[in-house]
Structures are given as C-alpha cells and as structure tokens.
C-alpha cells in the first residue's frame, strides 16, 4: 500500500454547476494552496454538468504535493427551497412578512434530496430541518 499523502488544506466553496472559472472566488482560494486552477475547473465542470443552474457546494482536499481531490455535495437547502417556492430571495423580515408558501410534499421532496448531507437519521427529521430553514426565510409550510 502506498504511503498516505499529507493534507495541506481543506477548501469549502459554493460554485454554480458547470460554471467554474479561474476568476474570483475560485482562483484566489485555490491559488494560495498552489493547486492547478484550470485542472480543478475542468474536473468540476465535467462532474457537475448534469446539474447546471444549481449552486453545488464542494470540499477540496489539497495535499502537500499540490495534488487535490474534491467531493461535491447536494445544493444548499435555501437554494432548493427558493426554487420550489418560485421566489428570487427569502423575506427581509422572516417572521413578519411571508413571501411564499410550500406544501408538506414539497418539503419532504427537498428533505429526501438533502438527506445524505443533513444530520438526520430519517426523512421525517430531515423534513423538520428543511421546514425550519423555510420558516427562517419567511416561507410558510402548510399541509
């Protein structure tokens, strides 16, 4: 078994799927660790091409020899909620002004999609987390 590589850093970014470019914020974040920026952009764009239009969080592990690996996550809950509710952004005053309404079925669908990234054992708990996020954005959840 080859010796394990030493980790030099962990970078977390949220990038639109299929649209990674060397421009900020990606370039400077990777450049300070000495990573080949174009190599990352090409690999990321190829892996996320099918999810175009979504913001995809990515965790990049940089090793001391300047090589890297990355893991893509599911889109942020807030992005999925905004898409399902059909709003541009959440409410400026979440508990005063309500901007949209989601059904329990929509919340459950988002919870099933996010389950692997959430700290929840089952879909019901994940749905409660998603409903809480929606409430904090000024979006009501109805049955």
From Swiss-Prot:
GO BP, sorted A to Z: translation
Stored Pfam families: Ribosomal_L11 (PF00298), Ribosomal_L11_N (PF03946)
**Keywords tagged on the record:** Methylation, Ribonucleoprotein, Ribosomal protein, RNA-binding, rRNA-binding
In terms of PROSITE patterns, this protein maps to: RIBOSOMAL_L11
Domain of life, source organism: Bacteria
* GO CC list: cytosolic large ribosomal subunit
The GO molecular function terms of this record are: large ribosomal subunit rRNA binding; structural constituent of ribosome
Query: Which residues are listed as membrane-spanning?
Result: none
**UniProt feature coiled coil, ranges:** none
What post-translational modification does the entry describe? Answer: One or more lysine residues are methylated.
Recorded hits in PANTHER family, A to Z, give:
60S RIBOSOMAL PROTEIN L12 (PTHR11661), LARGE RIBOSOMAL SUBUNIT PROTEIN UL11M (PTHR11661:SF1)
Family statement drawn from the similarity comment of this UniProt entry: Belongs to the universal ribosomal protein uL11 family.
Subunit record text: Part of the ribosomal stalk of the 50S ribosomal subunit. Interacts with L10 and the large rRNA to form the base of the stalk. L10 forms an elongated spine to which L12 dimers bind in a sequential fashion forming a multimeric L10(L12)X complex.
User: What functional role does this protein have?
Assistant: Forms part of the ribosomal stalk which helps the ribosome interact with GTP-bound translation factors.
Q: What is this protein called?
A: Large ribosomal subunit protein uL11
Q: What is the lineage of its organism?
A: Bacteria, Bacillati, Actinomycetota, Actinomycetes, Kineosporiales
